[in-house]
Amino acid sequence: MKKSSKEISSSQSLKNGGSDHFFNTSLMYVLAACLASFIFGYQVSVLNTIKNFIVIEFGWCTGNKVECDDSTLKSSFLLASVFIGAVVGSGFSGYLVQHGRRFSLLVIYNFFILVSILTSITHHFHTILFSRLLSGFGIGLITVSVPMYISEMTHKDKKGAYGVLHQLFITFGIFVAVLLGMAMGEAPDAKSVDALGEFQKIWWRLMFFFPCLISILGIVLLTFFYKEETPYYLFENGKIEESKKILKKIYGTDNVDEPLKAIKDAVEQNEAAKKNSISLMRAMQIPSYRNVILLGCILSGLQQFTGINVLVSNSNELYKEFLSNKLITTLSVIMTVVNFLMTFPAIYIVEKLGRKTLLLCGCAGVICAFLPTAIANQIDSTSAFVKNLSIAATFVMIISFAVSYGPVLWIYLHEMFPSEIKDSAASLASLVNWVCAIIVVFPSDIIIKKSPTILFFIFSGMSILSFLFIFFFIKETKGGEIGTSPYITMEERQKHMGKSAV
């Protein structure tokens, strides 16, 4: 019996590890990029378990109150410096990705080799602060480069699932950073004057060096195995046959006319936008474009006010208010394991439930976690029940974030903007995200020492605001074509881009 063309196409797709399966050629490219996501998570969390060891080795706090207050301020700067650097990096990322998505990843990996070496040999506050600022700069580049690479290197039906891998590897990096920190032993008090052991003096430096090894692996993969640029970038630069070739790998079939046409349409729209000078500044003067940019920036900024980066970068300090030193790092490790594992469900439900529904569920989870906890702490923060409730609340929050706001935001930011402003608008939204991270993380050390209840009230209140904002203003993007936006009609875009955008 003669097979139909559909059957032949299907069998060929299976033979090539096509798009019907989660594990296929496209996934290999995505994983090579997600090593940068791992570095992102690792760098954000690495100070969580070793910060106090650094304070002791550098002798920032030896018992004098003024000296120790100054030490707390230094610790706050070290925590926030990554996010300050990320603001600059995310602002620069839009320029970098214009030279190639794969190229930007190679720049990032080479950059982190240098940064890892610099951080591991530091001996002074100013040098470690500078190296942490550089780490943040690299992270800022990652926030735009990796999601864009994944979005353009992925089958249309897998964009959501593969997009979640960016967040999954971030959580894995967070987990590994805290796990390696366990080798340092019991979390010390920053005011301790006891000298560190030889192993501890070496180990915290090796922890800073570790991303260098991951970066080398990333360079090897992108240089020798996954050498192609994204099909969108290739087509945009006139390399149509090369674009078609990589699309065949991604889709697992020789028939790639439909995705090629989608890229062609998106590139033509983008070309028309460039001819008509739809810059970010001009877009902000056009109501329809300004609205979608503001929505993306607000959504991105609100993510930080769930409190995620306080838990990721400073959970040890928070848990000190509720636990003995012996259990602090262990609990932080358990928290990062939960964070990592609970990102997996998002891979499967992001395409089933959609982006908006997941965002709403995540905000509701944070509200349910922190609001009762804040009220309970206000009534009696000394009771064992309230302390246990506070610890449980952090886990409920982590679970809620891991399956929703964490992975979905970065997918959404690359689906909500039309192609003519996508690069610059996504970069601006990422920049806003990092500015808000600084606002939240920098005072966290001081606020935790004063009263964790304040943080619980802030995070629950902002999550209520986030829920209302998403419910009333955010639209679904699931299943949308590349380069389109549910917020701006093609007619509206043509009005500003010209008829050539059709």
From Swiss-Prot:
Any one GO molecular function term: hexose transmembrane transporter activity
Residues reported to bind beta-D-glucose: 167, 303, 309, 339
Topology, Extracellular side: 48-76, 124-132, 185-205, 313-329, 378-390, 449-453
Residue numbers binding alpha-D-glucose: 167, 303-304, 309, 410
Subcellular location(s) of the protein: Cell membrane
Membrane topology value: Multi-pass membrane protein
Keyword match Membrane: yes
Record-annotated membrane-spanning stretches: 27-47, 77-97, 103-123, 133-153, 164-184, 206-226, 292-312, 330-350, 357-377, 391-411, 428-448, 454-474
Stated role: Sodium-independent facilitative hexose transporter. Can transport D-glucose and D-fructose. Can transport D-mannose, D-galactose, D-xylose and D-glucosamine.
Record protein name field: Hexose transporter 1
Source organism per UniProt: Plasmodium vivax (strain Brazil I)
Gene (UniProt): HT1
